[in-house]
Protein backbone atom coordinates (compact mmCIF):
# COMPACT_ATOMS: atom_id res chain seq x y z
CA UNK A 1 0.00 0.00 0.00
CA UNK A 2 1.28 3.47 -0.91
CA UNK A 3 2.53 5.66 1.92
CA UNK A 4 2.50 9.42 2.32
CA UNK A 5 5.66 11.45 1.92
CA UNK A 6 4.58 12.96 5.27
CA UNK A 7 7.18 15.69 5.59
CA UNK A 8 10.12 13.59 4.40
CA UNK A 9 12.57 15.81 2.48
CA UNK A 10 14.93 14.73 -0.27
CA UNK A 11 18.51 15.73 0.55
CA UNK A 12 20.28 14.59 -2.64
CA UNK A 13 19.59 13.66 -6.25
CA UNK A 14 20.50 10.04 -6.92
CA UNK A 15 22.94 10.68 -9.75
CA UNK A 16 24.78 13.44 -7.87
CA UNK A 17 25.94 11.38 -4.88
CA UNK A 18 29.69 10.73 -4.88
CA UNK A 19 32.54 9.60 -2.64
CA UNK A 20 32.36 13.02 -0.98
CA UNK A 21 29.17 11.91 0.79
CA UNK A 22 30.66 8.67 2.22
CA UNK A 23 29.61 8.35 5.86
CA UNK A 24 26.79 10.87 5.51
CA UNK A 25 23.07 10.22 5.90
CA UNK A 26 21.02 10.97 2.79
CA UNK A 27 17.41 10.81 1.64
CA UNK A 28 16.77 9.96 -2.01
CA UNK A 29 13.51 9.60 -3.92
CA UNK A 30 12.68 8.16 -7.29
CA UNK A 31 11.69 5.06 -9.23
CA UNK A 32 12.86 1.46 -8.96
CA UNK A 33 14.90 0.75 -12.09
CA UNK A 34 15.80 -2.83 -11.06
CA UNK A 35 15.63 -5.09 -8.03
CA UNK A 36 18.12 -7.89 -7.49
CA UNK A 37 18.10 -10.46 -4.68
CA UNK A 38 21.59 -11.77 -3.99
CA UNK A 39 22.82 -13.82 -1.06
CA UNK A 40 20.04 -12.72 1.29
CA UNK A 41 20.58 -9.06 0.41
CA UNK A 42 18.35 -6.91 -1.84
CA UNK A 43 19.93 -4.44 -4.28
CA UNK A 44 17.80 -1.65 -5.72
CA UNK A 45 18.79 0.66 -8.57
CA UNK A 46 16.97 3.87 -7.67
CA UNK A 47 16.49 6.28 -10.56
CA UNK A 48 15.55 9.94 -10.63
CA UNK A 49 16.08 12.52 -13.34
CA UNK A 50 19.76 12.92 -12.43
CA UNK A 51 20.71 9.26 -12.78
CA UNK A 52 20.91 6.03 -10.79
CA UNK A 53 22.25 5.07 -7.38
CA UNK A 54 22.43 1.59 -5.86
CA UNK A 55 20.63 1.01 -2.55
CA UNK A 56 21.38 -2.07 -0.44
CA UNK A 57 18.84 -3.54 2.00
CA UNK A 58 20.36 -6.01 4.46
CA UNK A 59 18.23 -7.73 7.13
CA UNK A 60 21.15 -7.50 9.56
CA UNK A 61 21.05 -3.73 9.22
CA UNK A 62 17.28 -3.08 9.26
CA UNK A 63 14.92 -6.03 9.03
CA UNK A 64 11.79 -3.89 8.58
CA UNK A 65 13.25 -2.00 5.60
CA UNK A 66 14.51 -5.29 4.14
CA UNK A 67 11.09 -6.90 4.39
CA UNK A 68 9.43 -3.93 2.70
CA UNK A 69 12.06 -4.03 -0.06
CA UNK A 70 10.89 -7.55 -0.99
CA UNK A 71 7.63 -5.95 -2.17
CA UNK A 72 9.35 -3.64 -4.68
CA UNK A 73 8.85 -4.01 -8.42
CA UNK A 74 10.03 -2.01 -11.44
CA UNK A 75 8.78 1.60 -11.50
CA UNK A 76 7.54 1.63 -7.91
CA UNK A 77 8.03 5.14 -6.51
CA UNK A 78 10.06 5.06 -3.30
CA UNK A 79 11.85 7.18 -0.72
CA UNK A 80 14.96 5.82 0.98
CA UNK A 81 16.87 7.06 4.00
CA UNK A 82 20.32 5.62 4.49
CA UNK A 83 24.05 6.10 4.78
CA UNK A 84 26.47 6.44 1.86
CA UNK A 85 29.16 3.77 1.80
CA UNK A 86 32.03 2.90 -0.51
CA UNK A 87 31.26 -0.17 -2.60
CA UNK A 88 33.35 -3.30 -2.06
CA UNK A 89 36.27 -3.39 -4.52
CA UNK A 90 34.76 -6.09 -6.72
CA UNK A 91 31.38 -4.33 -7.00
CA UNK A 92 32.54 -0.98 -8.41
CA UNK A 93 30.65 -0.04 -11.60
CA UNK A 94 32.71 2.30 -13.83
CA UNK A 95 29.78 2.74 -16.26
CA UNK A 96 27.77 5.08 -14.01
CA UNK A 97 28.84 8.24 -12.13
CA UNK A 98 27.74 6.74 -8.79
CA UNK A 99 29.52 3.44 -9.42
CA UNK A 100 31.96 3.82 -6.52
CA UNK A 101 29.33 4.18 -3.81
CA UNK A 102 26.05 2.71 -2.59
CA UNK A 103 23.46 3.61 0.03
CA UNK A 104 22.87 1.32 2.98
CA UNK A 105 19.08 1.51 3.24
CA UNK A 106 17.85 2.14 6.78
CA UNK A 107 14.33 3.27 6.02
CA UNK A 108 12.04 2.70 3.01
CA UNK A 109 8.73 4.25 2.05
CA UNK A 110 6.71 3.04 -0.93
CA UNK A 111 5.12 6.26 -2.23
CA UNK A 112 3.26 4.59 -5.11
CA UNK A 113 3.07 1.24 -6.84
CA UNK A 114 3.24 0.56 -10.58
CA UNK A 115 1.82 -1.89 -13.05
CA UNK A 116 4.29 -3.66 -15.32
CA UNK A 117 5.24 -1.04 -17.96
CA UNK A 118 4.52 -1.84 -21.65
CA UNK A 119 8.25 -1.46 -22.35
CA UNK A 120 11.44 -1.34 -20.33
CA UNK A 121 12.60 2.06 -19.12
CA UNK A 122 15.94 1.93 -20.88
CA UNK A 123 17.62 3.60 -23.85
CA UNK A 124 18.16 0.27 -25.61
CA UNK A 125 14.56 -0.68 -26.34
CA UNK A 126 13.14 -2.04 -29.56
CA UNK A 127 9.52 -0.90 -29.63
CA UNK A 128 7.47 1.05 -32.15
CA UNK A 129 7.35 4.82 -31.88
CA UNK A 130 3.55 4.84 -31.64
CA UNK A 131 3.76 2.79 -28.43
CA UNK A 132 6.40 5.16 -27.05
CA UNK A 133 4.19 8.15 -27.86
CA UNK A 134 1.07 6.53 -26.37
CA UNK A 135 2.95 6.07 -23.09
CA UNK A 136 5.04 9.20 -23.47
CA UNK A 137 5.16 9.77 -19.72
CA UNK A 138 7.03 6.46 -19.45
CA UNK A 139 9.20 7.19 -22.47
CA UNK A 140 10.28 10.46 -20.83
CA UNK A 141 11.77 8.48 -17.94
CA UNK A 142 14.45 7.07 -20.25
CA UNK A 143 17.87 8.71 -19.71
CA UNK A 144 18.21 9.89 -23.31
CA UNK A 145 14.83 11.62 -23.30
CA UNK A 146 15.52 13.34 -19.98
CA UNK A 147 18.90 14.45 -21.28
CA UNK A 148 17.23 15.92 -24.38
CA UNK A 149 14.67 17.81 -22.31
CA UNK A 150 17.39 19.17 -20.05
CA UNK A 151 19.35 20.31 -23.11
CA UNK A 152 16.22 22.01 -24.45
CA UNK A 153 15.93 23.90 -21.18
CA UNK A 154 19.63 24.87 -21.27
CA UNK A 155 19.36 26.11 -24.86
CA UNK A 156 16.32 28.24 -24.06
CA UNK A 157 17.89 29.67 -20.91
CA UNK A 158 21.20 30.40 -22.66
CA UNK A 159 19.33 32.07 -25.52
CA UNK A 160 17.37 34.26 -23.12
CA UNK A 161 20.48 35.20 -21.16
CA UNK A 162 22.51 36.00 -24.29
CA UNK A 163 19.80 38.14 -25.87
CA UNK A 164 19.13 39.91 -22.59
CA UNK A 165 22.85 40.69 -22.36
CA UNK A 166 22.58 42.21 -25.85
CA UNK A 167 19.71 44.53 -24.99
CA UNK A 168 16.75 42.49 -26.25
CA UNK A 169 13.30 42.40 -24.68
CA UNK A 170 11.24 39.23 -24.66
CA UNK A 171 7.78 40.21 -25.89
CA UNK A 172 4.83 37.88 -26.43
CA UNK A 173 2.76 38.25 -29.59
CA UNK A 174 -0.83 37.03 -30.15
CA UNK A 175 -1.64 33.37 -30.71
CA UNK A 176 -5.14 34.19 -31.97
CA UNK A 177 -4.61 36.32 -35.07
CA UNK A 178 -6.06 36.49 -38.59
CA UNK A 179 -5.44 34.52 -41.74
CA UNK A 180 -3.42 36.11 -44.56
CA UNK A 181 -3.30 35.58 -48.34
CA UNK A 182 -0.21 33.43 -47.85
CA UNK A 183 -1.92 31.45 -45.10
CA UNK A 184 -3.29 28.46 -47.01
CA UNK A 185 -1.89 26.21 -44.29
CA UNK A 186 -3.28 28.12 -41.33
CA UNK A 187 -4.95 26.37 -38.44
CA UNK A 188 -8.32 28.10 -38.09
CA UNK A 189 -10.16 28.72 -34.82
CA UNK A 190 -13.88 29.52 -35.10
CA UNK A 191 -15.18 32.47 -33.11
CA UNK A 192 -18.25 31.81 -30.96
CA UNK A 193 -18.84 35.52 -30.43
CA UNK A 194 -18.48 36.38 -34.13
CA UNK A 195 -20.37 33.68 -36.08
CA UNK A 196 -18.78 32.79 -39.42
CA UNK A 197 -15.50 34.42 -38.47
CA UNK A 198 -12.25 32.65 -37.70
CA UNK A 199 -8.98 33.34 -35.98
CA UNK A 200 -5.80 31.80 -37.38
CA UNK A 201 -2.99 30.37 -35.30
CA UNK A 202 0.28 32.06 -36.34
CA UNK A 203 2.71 30.36 -38.70
CA UNK A 204 5.19 32.93 -37.38
CA UNK A 205 5.04 36.23 -35.46
CA UNK A 206 6.28 38.04 -38.60
CA UNK A 207 3.83 40.94 -38.82
CA UNK A 208 3.70 41.57 -35.09
CA UNK A 209 7.46 41.68 -34.68
CA UNK A 210 7.63 44.25 -37.49
CA UNK A 211 4.96 46.27 -35.72
CA UNK A 212 7.04 46.09 -32.55
CA UNK A 213 9.88 47.71 -34.49
CA UNK A 214 7.52 50.47 -35.67
CA UNK A 215 6.48 50.74 -32.02
CA UNK A 216 10.04 51.57 -30.99
CA UNK A 217 10.88 48.33 -29.17
CA UNK A 218 14.08 48.17 -31.29
CA UNK A 219 15.31 44.79 -30.02
CA UNK A 220 12.75 41.99 -29.65
CA UNK A 221 12.92 38.27 -29.19
CA UNK A 222 10.49 35.50 -28.38
CA UNK A 223 10.67 31.75 -28.04
CA UNK A 224 7.51 31.46 -30.07
CA UNK A 225 5.02 28.69 -30.66
CA UNK A 226 4.07 28.44 -34.33
CA UNK A 227 1.51 26.33 -36.18
CA UNK A 228 1.34 25.02 -39.74
CA UNK A 229 -1.33 22.69 -41.12
CA UNK A 230 0.75 21.08 -43.84
CA UNK A 231 1.34 17.59 -45.11
CA UNK A 232 3.93 16.28 -42.72
CA UNK A 233 7.28 15.05 -43.93
CA UNK A 234 9.99 13.53 -41.82
CA UNK A 235 10.97 15.83 -38.97
CA UNK A 236 8.09 18.26 -39.37
CA UNK A 237 5.56 19.05 -36.66
CA UNK A 238 2.19 20.84 -36.93
CA UNK A 239 3.16 22.92 -33.88
CA UNK A 240 6.76 23.91 -33.44
CA UNK A 241 8.95 26.38 -31.59
CA UNK A 242 11.21 29.03 -33.03
CA UNK A 243 13.71 31.46 -31.60
CA UNK A 244 12.37 34.67 -33.11
CA UNK A 245 14.52 37.82 -33.28
CA UNK A 246 13.99 41.31 -34.74
CA UNK A 247 16.21 44.42 -34.57
CA UNK A 248 15.97 48.05 -35.69
CA UNK A 249 18.61 50.30 -37.26
CA UNK A 250 20.77 47.40 -38.47
CA UNK A 251 22.01 45.67 -41.60
CA UNK A 252 22.57 41.97 -42.24
CA UNK A 253 26.12 42.06 -40.85
CA UNK A 254 24.66 43.04 -37.46
CA UNK A 255 22.35 40.02 -37.61
CA UNK A 256 25.25 37.74 -38.57
CA UNK A 257 27.40 39.01 -35.69
CA UNK A 258 24.60 38.54 -33.15
CA UNK A 259 23.73 35.04 -34.38
CA UNK A 260 27.35 33.89 -34.60
CA UNK A 261 27.78 34.81 -30.94
CA UNK A 262 24.58 33.04 -29.94
CA UNK A 263 25.49 29.87 -31.84
CA UNK A 264 28.93 29.86 -30.27
CA UNK A 265 27.31 29.77 -26.83
CA UNK A 266 24.70 27.17 -27.75
CA UNK A 267 27.12 24.74 -29.36
CA UNK A 268 29.47 25.15 -26.40
CA UNK A 269 26.72 23.51 -24.31
CA UNK A 270 27.58 20.22 -26.05
CA UNK A 271 31.32 20.92 -26.28
CA UNK A 272 31.31 21.81 -29.98
CA UNK A 273 33.51 24.74 -30.96
CA UNK A 274 32.44 26.77 -33.96
CA UNK A 275 34.59 29.27 -35.88
CA UNK A 276 34.66 32.94 -34.93
CA UNK A 277 33.81 33.89 -38.50
CA UNK A 278 31.26 31.90 -40.48
CA UNK A 279 31.65 32.03 -44.29
CA UNK A 280 29.10 33.80 -46.48
CA UNK A 281 28.03 32.32 -49.83
CA UNK A 282 25.72 33.92 -52.42
CA UNK A 283 22.65 31.87 -53.32
CA UNK A 284 23.68 31.50 -56.95
CA UNK A 285 27.11 30.19 -55.99
CA UNK A 286 25.50 27.61 -53.71
CA UNK A 287 23.23 26.44 -56.53
CA UNK A 288 26.07 26.42 -59.08
CA UNK A 289 28.53 24.48 -56.90
CA UNK A 290 26.29 22.28 -54.78
CA UNK A 291 22.91 22.22 -56.51
CA UNK A 292 21.24 23.43 -53.32
CA UNK A 293 20.61 26.61 -51.35
CA UNK A 294 21.41 24.51 -48.26
CA UNK A 295 24.90 23.33 -49.22
CA UNK A 296 26.57 20.55 -47.27
CA UNK A 297 30.23 21.60 -47.15
CA UNK A 298 31.55 18.55 -45.33
CA UNK A 299 32.62 16.87 -48.57
CA UNK A 300 33.50 17.79 -52.13
CA UNK A 301 31.90 16.31 -55.26
CA UNK A 302 30.89 19.78 -56.46
CA UNK A 303 28.86 20.29 -59.63
CA UNK A 304 31.02 21.19 -62.65
CA UNK A 305 29.64 22.94 -65.73
CA UNK A 306 30.87 21.34 -68.98
CA UNK A 307 28.39 23.14 -71.25
CA UNK A 308 31.16 25.06 -73.06
CA UNK A 309 33.05 21.83 -73.72
CA UNK A 310 30.09 19.99 -75.28
CA UNK A 311 28.11 22.81 -76.89
CA UNK A 312 29.15 21.73 -80.41
CA UNK A 313 29.34 18.02 -79.69
CA UNK A 314 27.89 15.38 -81.99
CA UNK A 315 26.20 14.01 -78.88
CA UNK A 316 22.90 15.84 -79.42
CA UNK A 317 21.61 15.12 -75.92
CA UNK A 318 24.31 17.50 -74.68
CA UNK A 319 24.70 20.01 -77.51
CA UNK A 320 20.95 20.28 -78.12
CA UNK A 321 20.25 21.17 -74.51
CA UNK A 322 22.97 23.85 -74.54
CA UNK A 323 21.59 25.35 -77.76
CA UNK A 324 18.14 25.53 -76.16
CA UNK A 325 19.48 27.52 -73.22
CA UNK A 326 20.01 24.61 -70.87
CA UNK A 327 23.23 23.36 -69.34
CA UNK A 328 25.26 20.20 -68.91
CA UNK A 329 26.79 19.60 -65.50
CA UNK A 330 28.45 16.68 -63.83
CA UNK A 331 29.79 15.39 -60.53
CA UNK A 332 32.92 13.33 -60.00
CA UNK A 333 32.41 10.29 -57.79
CA UNK A 334 36.06 9.72 -56.88
CA UNK A 335 36.90 6.01 -57.01
CA UNK A 336 33.42 5.20 -58.28
CA UNK A 337 34.47 3.59 -61.56
CA UNK A 338 34.22 0.17 -59.93
CA UNK A 339 30.47 0.70 -59.36
CA UNK A 340 28.38 -2.05 -60.97
CA UNK A 341 25.99 -1.13 -63.76
CA UNK A 342 23.04 -1.87 -61.46
CA UNK A 343 24.17 0.88 -59.09
CA UNK A 344 24.50 3.39 -61.94
CA UNK A 345 21.03 2.40 -63.16
CA UNK A 346 19.80 3.14 -59.64
CA UNK A 347 21.35 6.60 -59.85
CA UNK A 348 19.55 7.12 -63.16
CA UNK A 349 16.20 6.22 -61.64
CA UNK A 350 16.95 8.53 -58.72
CA UNK A 351 17.63 11.67 -60.77
CA UNK A 352 14.38 11.12 -62.67
CA UNK A 353 12.54 11.81 -59.40
CA UNK A 354 13.78 15.40 -59.73
CA UNK A 355 12.71 15.85 -63.34
CA UNK A 356 15.88 14.74 -65.15
CA UNK A 357 15.29 12.75 -68.32
CA UNK A 358 18.30 10.55 -67.69
CA UNK A 359 21.87 10.29 -66.46
CA UNK A 360 24.95 10.09 -68.69
CA UNK A 361 28.11 8.56 -67.28
CA UNK A 362 31.78 7.92 -67.96
CA UNK A 363 33.80 5.41 -65.92
CA UNK A 364 37.58 5.95 -66.06
CA UNK A 365 38.78 2.38 -65.59
CA UNK A 366 42.36 1.08 -65.51
CA UNK A 367 41.95 -0.36 -69.00
CA UNK A 368 40.35 2.75 -70.50
CA UNK A 369 37.00 4.54 -70.66
CA UNK A 370 33.74 2.71 -70.24
CA UNK A 371 30.70 4.74 -71.21
CA UNK A 372 27.66 4.52 -73.47
CA UNK A 373 28.27 8.12 -74.61
CA UNK A 374 32.06 8.15 -75.16
CA UNK A 375 31.72 7.14 -78.82
CA UNK A 376 29.77 10.36 -79.49
CA UNK A 377 32.42 12.60 -77.93
CA UNK A 378 35.65 13.68 -79.61
CA UNK A 379 39.03 13.15 -77.98
CA UNK A 380 39.24 16.90 -77.38
CA UNK A 381 35.81 16.95 -75.71
CA UNK A 382 36.68 13.99 -73.49
CA UNK A 383 39.93 15.62 -72.41
CA UNK A 384 38.09 18.89 -71.77
CA UNK A 385 35.52 17.10 -69.62
CA UNK A 386 38.21 15.31 -67.61
CA UNK A 387 40.11 18.55 -67.05
CA UNK A 388 37.00 20.46 -65.94
CA UNK A 389 36.03 17.72 -63.53
CA UNK A 390 39.49 16.95 -62.16
CA UNK A 391 39.03 13.35 -63.25
CA UNK A 392 41.57 10.58 -62.76
CA UNK A 393 41.68 6.86 -63.39
CA UNK A 394 39.19 5.16 -61.07
CA UNK A 395 36.63 8.00 -61.10
CA UNK A 396 32.98 7.85 -62.19
CA UNK A 397 31.64 10.97 -63.91
CA UNK A 398 27.87 11.50 -63.81
CA UNK A 399 26.07 14.08 -65.98
CA UNK A 400 22.64 15.67 -66.28
CA UNK A 401 21.64 17.84 -69.26
CA UNK A 402 18.51 19.95 -68.83
CA UNK A 403 17.31 23.38 -67.78
CA UNK A 404 19.39 24.79 -64.92
CA UNK A 405 16.83 24.25 -62.15
CA UNK A 406 16.46 20.54 -62.96
CA UNK A 407 20.23 20.05 -63.33
CA UNK A 408 20.83 21.61 -59.91
CA UNK A 409 18.05 19.68 -58.20
CA UNK A 410 18.97 16.33 -59.74
CA UNK A 411 22.74 16.50 -59.26
CA UNK A 412 22.50 18.23 -55.89
CA UNK A 413 20.40 15.40 -54.53
CA UNK A 414 22.45 12.69 -56.26
CA UNK A 415 25.58 14.19 -54.68
CA UNK A 416 24.05 13.78 -51.23
CA UNK A 417 22.77 10.28 -51.94
CA UNK A 418 26.19 9.02 -53.05
CA UNK A 419 27.95 10.70 -50.11
CA UNK A 420 25.60 9.09 -47.58
CA UNK A 421 25.71 5.64 -49.18
CA UNK A 422 29.48 5.62 -49.65
CA UNK A 423 30.39 7.02 -46.24
CA UNK A 424 31.93 10.19 -47.66
CA UNK A 425 30.51 12.44 -44.92
CA UNK A 426 32.91 12.68 -41.95
CA UNK A 427 31.51 12.28 -38.44
CA UNK A 428 31.85 15.06 -35.91
CA UNK A 429 32.42 17.79 -38.51
CA UNK A 430 30.30 20.96 -38.43
CA UNK A 431 30.34 23.23 -41.48
CA UNK A 432 28.38 26.45 -41.10
CA UNK A 433 27.60 28.90 -43.89
CA UNK A 434 25.44 31.98 -44.39
CA UNK A 435 23.63 31.83 -47.73
CA UNK A 436 22.70 35.32 -48.99
CA UNK A 437 21.25 37.18 -51.98
CA UNK A 438 18.31 34.84 -52.58
CA UNK A 439 15.93 35.64 -55.43
CA UNK A 440 13.21 37.94 -54.13
CA UNK A 441 10.56 35.96 -55.99
CA UNK A 442 10.16 32.98 -58.29
CA UNK A 443 7.57 32.08 -60.88
CA UNK A 444 5.04 29.46 -59.80
CA UNK A 445 3.76 27.70 -62.91
CA UNK A 446 0.84 26.13 -61.03
CA UNK A 447 -0.41 29.50 -59.80
CA UNK A 448 0.64 31.37 -62.94
CA UNK A 449 2.27 34.19 -60.99
CA UNK A 450 5.37 35.20 -59.09
CA UNK A 451 5.49 34.14 -55.45
CA UNK A 452 7.80 35.33 -52.70
CA UNK A 453 10.87 33.13 -52.23
CA UNK A 454 10.76 33.81 -48.48
CA UNK A 455 7.85 36.14 -47.66
CA UNK A 456 6.46 39.35 -49.21
CA UNK A 457 7.99 41.64 -46.56
CA UNK A 458 11.60 40.88 -47.54
CA UNK A 459 13.50 43.88 -48.92
CA UNK A 460 15.13 43.70 -52.36
CA UNK A 461 18.78 44.65 -52.80
CA UNK A 462 18.89 48.40 -53.36
CA UNK A 463 20.58 48.08 -56.75
CA UNK A 464 17.90 45.64 -57.97
CA UNK A 465 14.82 47.73 -57.10
CA UNK A 466 14.57 49.19 -60.67
CA UNK A 467 14.00 45.62 -61.94
CA UNK A 468 10.63 45.41 -60.17
CA UNK A 469 8.88 46.81 -63.24
CA UNK A 470 10.79 44.84 -65.87
CA UNK A 471 12.55 41.67 -64.65
CA UNK A 472 11.19 40.71 -61.22
CA UNK A 473 12.71 37.21 -61.46
CA UNK A 474 16.19 38.76 -61.53
CA UNK A 475 15.77 40.73 -58.30
CA UNK A 476 17.97 39.60 -55.44
CA UNK A 477 16.75 40.02 -51.89
CA UNK A 478 18.23 40.96 -48.54
CA UNK A 479 17.35 37.47 -47.29
CA UNK A 480 19.77 35.10 -45.61
CA UNK A 481 19.73 31.53 -44.32
CA UNK A 482 21.93 30.01 -41.63
CA UNK A 483 22.94 26.55 -42.84
CA UNK A 484 24.75 23.72 -41.07
CA UNK A 485 25.77 20.49 -42.79
CA UNK A 486 23.10 20.84 -45.46
CA UNK A 487 20.29 21.75 -43.04
CA UNK A 488 18.72 25.18 -42.76
CA UNK A 489 18.73 26.04 -39.06
CA UNK A 490 17.40 29.56 -39.45
CA UNK A 491 16.35 32.15 -41.96
CA UNK A 492 15.60 35.84 -42.04
CA UNK A 493 15.94 39.08 -43.94
CA UNK A 494 16.12 42.82 -43.83
CA UNK A 495 12.50 43.96 -44.15
CA UNK A 496 10.80 46.55 -46.29
CA UNK A 497 10.12 49.63 -44.15
CA UNK A 498 8.62 51.87 -46.80
CA UNK A 499 4.95 51.73 -47.82
CA UNK A 500 5.52 52.63 -51.48
CA UNK A 501 8.17 49.92 -51.93
CA UNK A 502 5.98 47.40 -50.11
CA UNK A 503 3.09 48.13 -52.48
CA UNK A 504 5.42 47.73 -55.49
CA UNK A 505 6.47 44.30 -54.24
CA UNK A 506 2.84 43.34 -53.60
CA UNK A 507 2.02 44.40 -57.15
CA UNK A 508 4.84 42.27 -58.60
CA UNK A 509 3.47 39.32 -56.60
CA UNK A 510 0.00 39.94 -58.05
CA UNK A 511 -1.36 40.93 -54.64
CA UNK A 512 -3.84 43.67 -55.49
CA UNK A 513 -4.01 46.92 -53.57
CA UNK A 514 -7.45 45.91 -52.33
CA UNK A 515 -6.27 42.51 -51.11
CA UNK A 516 -3.13 44.02 -49.56
CA UNK A 517 -5.21 46.62 -47.74
CA UNK A 518 -7.68 43.99 -46.56
CA UNK A 519 -5.09 41.57 -45.20
CA UNK A 520 -2.12 43.79 -44.31
CA UNK A 521 -3.79 47.16 -43.86
CA UNK A 522 -2.64 47.50 -40.25
CA UNK A 523 1.01 47.04 -41.28
CA UNK A 524 0.75 49.41 -44.24
CA UNK A 525 -0.97 51.97 -42.02
CA UNK A 526 1.87 51.64 -39.51
CA UNK A 527 4.35 52.47 -42.28
CA UNK A 528 2.71 55.92 -42.51
CA UNK A 529 4.14 56.82 -39.11
CA UNK A 530 7.87 56.33 -39.47
CA UNK A 531 9.12 52.75 -39.67
CA UNK A 532 12.81 52.26 -38.84
CA UNK A 533 15.06 50.09 -40.99
CA UNK A 534 14.75 46.65 -39.43
CA UNK A 535 15.41 42.98 -39.92
CA UNK A 536 15.69 39.73 -38.10
CA UNK A 537 15.87 35.99 -38.15
CA UNK A 538 14.08 32.93 -36.80
CA UNK A 539 15.57 29.58 -35.83
CA UNK A 540 13.68 26.33 -35.59
CA UNK A 541 14.40 25.37 -31.99
CA UNK A 542 13.39 21.74 -32.51
CA UNK A 543 15.67 21.26 -35.52
CA UNK A 544 18.54 23.00 -33.72
CA UNK A 545 18.09 20.64 -30.78
CA UNK A 546 18.19 17.63 -33.11
CA UNK A 547 21.66 18.74 -34.18
CA UNK A 548 22.89 19.55 -30.68
CA UNK A 549 21.62 16.28 -29.20
CA UNK A 550 22.55 14.07 -32.15
CA UNK A 551 18.93 12.87 -32.40
CA UNK A 552 17.60 11.37 -35.61
CA UNK A 553 13.99 12.39 -34.97
CA UNK A 554 12.56 15.77 -34.06
CA UNK A 555 10.07 13.92 -31.89
CA UNK A 556 12.92 12.96 -29.56
CA UNK A 557 13.54 16.59 -28.56
CA UNK A 558 9.89 17.55 -27.94
CA UNK A 559 8.12 16.49 -24.74
CA UNK A 560 4.75 15.70 -26.33
CA UNK A 561 5.08 15.62 -30.13
CA UNK A 562 2.60 14.61 -32.81
CA UNK A 563 3.09 11.70 -35.19
CA UNK A 564 3.74 12.12 -38.91
CA UNK A 565 -0.04 12.01 -39.30
CA UNK A 566 -0.36 15.05 -37.01
CA UNK A 567 -2.05 13.03 -34.28
CA UNK A 568 -1.32 12.23 -30.65
CA UNK A 569 -1.51 8.57 -29.58
CA UNK A 570 -1.40 9.80 -25.98
CA UNK A 571 -4.42 12.15 -25.99
CA UNK A 572 -6.00 10.82 -29.20
CA UNK A 573 -6.05 14.35 -30.62
CA UNK A 574 -7.51 15.45 -32.95
CA UNK A 575 -10.93 14.26 -31.83
CA UNK A 576 -14.57 14.80 -32.64
CA UNK A 577 -16.49 17.28 -30.51
CA UNK A 578 -20.03 17.35 -29.20
CA UNK A 579 -22.81 18.54 -31.50
CA UNK A 580 -23.67 21.20 -28.92
CA UNK A 581 -20.20 22.73 -29.23
CA UNK A 582 -20.50 22.83 -33.01
CA UNK A 583 -23.89 24.56 -32.79
CA UNK A 584 -22.47 27.18 -30.43
CA UNK A 585 -19.75 27.84 -33.00
CA UNK A 586 -22.28 27.89 -35.86
CA UNK A 587 -20.44 25.04 -37.59
CA UNK A 588 -22.11 22.28 -39.57
CA UNK A 589 -20.12 19.23 -40.71
CA UNK A 590 -21.35 17.40 -43.81
Curated annotation (Swiss-Prot):
A Pfam family annotated for this UniProt entry: tRNA_anti-codon
Keyword Ion transport assigned: no
Catalytic activity line of the entry: tRNA(Asx) + L-aspartate + ATP = L-aspartyl-tRNA(Asx) + AMP + diphosphate
Signal peptide: none
Coiled-coil boundaries: none
Entry EC no(s): 6.1.1.23
Residues of the site described as Important for tRNA non-discrimination: 38, 90
GO biological process terms, semicolon-separated: aspartyl-tRNA aminoacylation
Cross-referenced InterPro entries: Aa-tRNA-synt_II, aa-tRNA-synth_II, aa-tRNA-synth_II/BPL/LPL, Asp-tRNA-ligase_1, Asp-tRNA-ligase_1_N, Asp/Asn-tRNA-synth_IIb, AspRS_core, GAD-like_sf
S-S bonds: none
Aspartate: region residues: 206-209
NCBIfam families: aspS_bact, PRK00476.1
Function: Aspartyl-tRNA synthetase with relaxed tRNA specificity since it is able to aspartylate not only its cognate tRNA(Asp) but also tRNA(Asn). Reaction proceeds in two steps: L-aspartate is first activated by ATP to form Asp-AMP and then transferred to the acceptor end of tRNA(Asp/Asn).
Protein name stated in the entry: Aspartate--tRNA(Asp/Asn) ligase
Record organism: Halothermothrix orenii (strain H 168 / OCM 544 / DSM 9562)
Lineage of producing organism: Bacteria, Bacillati, Bacillota, Clostridia, Halanaerobiales
